[in-house]
Amino acid sequence: MSGMTTYAQGTLIWIKHEEEVWMQAEIVTANEKEIIVKTAEEPDGRIILAPNEPIFLRTTDLFTTEGLSVMDDLTQLDHLHEPAVLSSLQNRFDVDKIYTFTGPILIALNPFKVIPGLYDDDVLRSFISTKPSTKPHVFNTSNMAYRGICDRSKSQTVLISGE
């Protein structure tokens, strides 16, 4: 098992997948020789993993009245590893939340479409304030830099990187 860790039956995990990169799974049994898991894609089938295959713990999905709960900041994730980060970004992307914090850094995903209301005047006004917002948005990043100049007389830098 990864790092000689033992896993209990029912443990929610991520396993490598050829097409999807990572796939959600649940441990059926685990011992020193093999780990048997089941997945939503193959509920009747079982996948047998070698003990040295990469496995990452997964948190139970949280649902609210609006649907799947998606964290505004990746540092709030219970497990901070590649599959958890990619899943969180995908879940946010699926509901048109293209901005996500990772600590003080803003991650922006290309939505490949127009998202109505994303840059409206009302949205802009909601970020123009002396109080910092906790919502991830490019307007928030701009306002924080502006406030740093005006309130603290400190030089500010906004680094933009992408393809």
Enumerate the language-model features and the residues they cover.
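N-terminal entry segment of cytoskeletal motor ATPase domains
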Residues: 1-161
